[in-house]
């Protein structure tokens, strides 16, 4: 993904102290990089979509017919909700280290609050929330820059939901 102000300003947090809501911040040599609030917003939009897909998972999902462009013009069938759930889970598992993965599983997947997570993992509140922010930044960047199809996780499935949240 090409990171510039026009891509990041729509999902940046207005009250961010680093970017002031612009979505980009200056680092060494005057280079602009996306702010961490943008990555956290991307993760939260993906996570909200994940929760919606899981909540609707008890019902039979619809099968989508997709056209594959090319010589033969084939068609494929897919289940978008199940694919999104699988992509979200597998990408998260692949990107996080053991400690972050444990917190991710307890807090995001199982829904434990911060008090229960801190008690179970024997960590203090500050360490827990710093790790949560680090997880959101790391996975937000990963979901936005996912190759070969970053649009699979972010653009078509999450961006409309992100605009509705913001």
PLM ranges: what are they?
Residues 110-127:
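Helix-turn-helix DNA-binding module
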Residues 88, 124, 128-146:
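DNA major-groove recognition helices of helix-turn-helix
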Residues 105-109, 122, 133:
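Short amphipathic alpha-helical surface patches that mediate protein-protein
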Residues 89, 93-97, 118:
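Amphipathic, well-packed alpha-helical segments that form the structural scaffold of globular domains
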Residues 1-91, 144-166:
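N-terminal interaction/assembly modules
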Residues 94-113:
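Short amphipathic alpha helix immediately N-terminal
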Residues 78, 94, 122-125:
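Short, charged/polar micro-motifs that form catalytic or ligand-binding hotspots
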